[in-house]
Amino acid sequence: MDRRTLTAIVLSFVLLTAFQFYMAWKYPPAELTGEQVQSGESSAPAPLASTAPVADALPPPVEGMAGSAPQQAMSQPLINTDAKSLLHFKNDLVEGSLSLQGGRLVGMDFLQHTDVLGGKPISFMGISQVESFYQESGFLPVAGSAIKAPDANTQWQLIGKESLQGAGEFKLVWDNGEGIVFEKLFSFAQGSYLFKVEDRLINNSAAALGVYHYSQFKRIPVINSQSMLAMSDFQGPMAYLNGERYQHSYEDLTAQDLREKGHGGWTGFSDKYFLAAMVAKPLPPEAQPRRYYFDYDRPNYRVGMVENSVIIPAGQSLAVDYDLFIGPKEISTLERSNLSLERSIDYGWFHFLAEPLVKVLNFFNSVVHNYGVAIILLTLAIKLLFFPLANKSYRSMNAMKKLQPKIEELKKLHGSDRNKMNEAMMKLYQTHKVNPLGGCLPILVQIPVFFALYKVLFLSVEMRHAPFMLWIPDLSAMDPFYVLPLLMGGSMFLQSKLNPTPSDPMQAKIMMFLPVIFTVMFLSFPSGLVLYWLVNNVLSISQQYYIMKKMEHEPS
């Protein structure tokens, strides 16, 4: 990487980082543009097209802990996790559990992803003394109705087996004793992170019922402060509605509740590598939109959706089904769902470049079966793609270098008159057909590609625990022996020797210390990123040497 490229990237990195800090301080990191409401308030929904209007509210807190401090609430499990109350299911990708108490999904382990390298399967959802993460859904009566509905303590009855493998369906039933039967079906398939949930209400009573359906995630997360490297890594409540992504931090939801409306999309919790999302069936454009909510129901953060209220006549029934995706944010897996789940990966401003880059990276890995080698091949492909631009840049730099003696003469002749000096230099450039910006513009074009690739390597779950070779067991972790950062620093030092020494003494000192600064900074970077930078430097050195040698034999 030549001096101009390095300077441009460093300046761009500093400016982008400073801008992100400013925007995070000045404005929320991302907006939920819906109406802000106070806790406990809700607006009356419009009915489905085929029903009469009835008023309702958002699902109330069901643990009865709304007034408790978070520390008190977390000191004991929120849900009965007794083995007798749990139903277990397993396919080739996940192992999970449902609780008969409350009819909730209370556990989800990813069998192909471990908590640490060589460790046990990562537990993404579950109940513990420190954190909890579960999903629930069902029907609730509209305001003013006295229907006895299932709650957090309801013990559902299982129809069928208590444990399923490969593929299957659990059926839970609860009769309220007043002629109303509630049913819940949870189904899963082999080789999939998608689950289907169907809630049914059978009205065998003598009166019509006014109800609404809700589904929600509740989570008590362990919130860690983010490092500088993870400034752009969003983790928290997220939704994709009406063709737009909405996201908000946990801290923001402690101050205010947020609401949105939409005819289709998904909502849930997004982590760096994993996603839990509820996907409702799309509504027709003429229908009233469903409502989505994001709030802090102490000690839980809640993300959910509420269907429009509906009246069920006596002797009739109602069924509402939706999909759950709970799995890793692998771009190929998300796109196969055809549910726009890939929008949960935020590549930032340069997403239009990052998305094809991650696909090319995955293609190379499918061929060589090693993401480290895939990074090398991708870096080589990018270098080949930009070779014409680099060639133009080096040629422009060489032409400017040849004009340097004449420029010095002009400085001596017109040094005290800036206007005449500029006019003389422009004539000189025109005479020799040299563009003074010719060496910079090709480099500026490459900077977005660099940042896009940075995001790809930093956010891709495919990099998590992916080995390279020898001493690199995990491309998403730092080099345990600092070999790659030291090699990278050495390559930068070699580059500085290939480039001419800057005439400005201060700039010369900065360029001399840059390899040391970057080496120290890269010590804690994921080894996959350091590998990219090292390979890029080696290829740049080779490229620069080749072009300069070729130009030495060309006539001036």
From Swiss-Prot:
Biological process annotations from GO: protein insertion into membrane; protein transport
Species the sequence originates in: Magnetococcus marinus (strain ATCC BAA-1437 / JCM 17883 / MC-1)
Name this polypeptide is given: Membrane protein insertase YidC
UniProt xrefs under InterPro entries: Membr_insert_YidC (IPR019998), Membr_insert_YidC_N (IPR028053), YidC/ALB3/OXA1/COX18 (IPR001708), YidC/Oxa/ALB_C (IPR028055), YidC_ALB_C (IPR047196), YidC_periplasmic_sf (IPR038221)
Compositionally biased tracts (Low complexity): 42-55
Topology class, membrane: Multi-pass membrane protein
Keywords: Cell inner membrane, Cell membrane, Chaperone, Membrane, Protein transport, Transmembrane, Transmembrane helix, Transport
Gene Ontology terms: cellular component: plasma membrane
Any one GO molecular function term: membrane insertase activity
